[in-house]
Every structure is written in structure tokens, then in C-alpha cells.
A protein has these predicted regions:
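Hydrophobic faces of well-ordered beta-strands that scaffold small-molecule active sites
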Residues: 3-7, 24-26, 53-57, 89-91, ...
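Glycine-rich phosphate-binding active-site loops on the catalytic face of alpha/beta enzymes
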Residues: 23-35, 80, 84-96, 141-154, ...
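Active-site mouth loops of central-metabolism enzymes
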Residues: 1-9, 57-75, 94, 117-129
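Hydrophobic, well-structured mid-protein blocks that either form specific transmembrane helices
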Residues: 86-142
Length: 243
């Protein structure tokens, strides 16, 4: 069972290295569900020994229906990820009707030749996950990251089981969303190939002065003084559950 830690910070990368997680998915912007990380963070993650590195390729938050210009930007980000030594890239593209965009996905898979391609949880926004799996196979993806089309992997466990059976070794199924110590073994029993988790914890900002009249994102609901990182103890508990 391969383990992958979703990482947004240098500290989370260090936790992955210390605990023995096999692969990291490197992202920015957790409140957006993950976007392309900074060059500096990619460079740092690549410097750590013993970790396989997959880089998120997502130019913005929101939906997964991209313009031609956005796809061109994603292709450039894939080229840069290769230059920095990434082992893989992570992306997902959909059609307006909720299907995998096979044409554009295959285009970016070709751009990523020599690297592993993960089709991310855009997969869970498709109309039919079993049909979407075949589209991901045809597009040349190495794996899909999925919660079984539900908010959490535990809620989607029966679909995960069906996806693992349908994949039949043609493509890897990686379960993610809400994976923790309490359900890691249960999810592993579905015969998926990998588990993806963030072991997320939040901590309060150290700022003593907080201007209540300003919201940097223009949205008062965004927790500007709450910082998100990985919790090393939770990572270790998950790994212990998996043996």
C-alpha cells in the first residue's frame, strides 16, 4: 500500500521525510483545494532524499473546465516541474457535461512523458466514476485520486471498491479525502493501490494585532489568521495502522 501525503508547506515535506511516507503531492492554497505550488517549494521538496515528488498542476481554484490559454499554462507548468526534477504531476480536466476531457488530458499526458500522471479529484466531479475511469485509462494516466464521488473516501467506500475491481491493474486507484487513523485499514481493504492524506491541523496565527477592517482575499469568511499544516503524530498513526 503506497502512502502519499498532501503537502502545502516546507514543514509538511519534512514530516513526510521523517515518517517514511513514500510520496508527496505538493500543492499551494489548501482553501482552494490545491493549486500549483511555488518554484521555491518544489525545489526544496526535490532536495529531500527518499521522497517521490508529484507536483499539482492547477492554475486556479474553481472548476476544472479550462480555456485554451489555461491548458497552455498547465503545459508550461509541467515542463517546469520536469526541470525541477518532479517524479510526477497531478491534474484533471473536465468537459462542460461532467466527463473527463480526454483530448486535453491526453495532450498534457504527452507533455508529461517520462513522469507519472495522477488525475486528481476532478474525477469526483464527473457524472459517472466508472465511465470516467475508462476515460482516464484511455488518456494515459498512471492513477486516479478519488473519494469515490463522495465528500469523503469512507462515504464513497463502495464505489472505491468497484473502481479497484474495474481497474484490474490497468491504472492505480488512490483513495483520498478524510483518510485518517480511524479508517486507514478499512479503506486499504477495498484493494485500492494507495492512500492519500493531509493529516491536517490548524493553528492560530501569532499576530497580536489583527485589523478587523481588512480581508486580503476580499471575503470575510476566509480564516486569515488560521494556518494549516500537517500533524506529524497523525501521519505516524496512519502509517502504524497500515503496518
Amino acid at each position: 500500500m503506497t502512502t502519499e501525503l498532501c503537502t502545502y508547506t516546507r514543514n509538511a515535506c519534512d514530516i513526510a521525510r521523517r515518517t517514511g511516507v513514500e510520496r508527496i503531492e505538493l500543492c499551494a492554497a489548501p482553501l482552494e483545494g490545491g493549486t500549483t505550488p511555488s518554484a521555491g517549494l518544489i525545489h526544496y521538496a526535490r532536495s529531500l532524499p527518499g521522497l517521490r515528488l508529484s507536483v499539482m498542476i492547477r492554475p486556479r481554484g474553481g472548476d476544472f473546465l479550462y480555456t485554451d490559454d489555461e491548458v497552455a499554462l498547465m503545459a508550461e507548468e509541467i515542463r517546469l516541474a520536469r526541470e525541477y526534477g518532479a517524479d510526477g504531476v497531478v491534474f484533471g480536466l473536465l468537459t462542460p457535461d461532467g466527463e473527463v476531457d480526454e483530448t486535453r488530458t491526453a495532450q498534457l499526458v504527452r507533455e508529461a512523458e517520462g513522469m507519472e500522471v495522477t488525475f486528481h479529484r476532478a474525477f469526483d466531479m464527473t457524472r459517472d466514476p466508472l465511465r470516467a475511469l475508462e476515460a482516464a485509462v484511455r488518456s494515459g494516466c498512471r492513477r486516479v485520486l478519488t473519494s469515490g464521488g463522495r465528500n469523503t473516501a469512507q462515504e464513497g467506500i463502495e464505489t472505491l471498491r468497484a473502481l479497484a475491481a474495474q481497474a484490474a491493474g490497468r491504472i492505480e486507484i488512490m483513495a483520498g479525502s478524510g483518510v485518517g487513523p480511524s479508517n486507514a485499514r478499512l479503506l486499504a481493504a477495498t484493494r485500492v493501490d494507495a492512500l492519500h492524506f493531509s493529516a491536517r491541523r490548524e493553528r492560530e496565527s501569532g499576530m497580536r494585532f489583527r485589523n478587523p477592517r481588512v480581508s486580503m482575499g476580499g471575503c470575510a469568511g476566509v480564516p486569515e489568521y488560521t494556518l494549516t499544516d500537517a500533524d506529524e503524530s497523525v501521519v505516524r498513526q496512519i502509517l502504524a495502522e497500515l503496518g
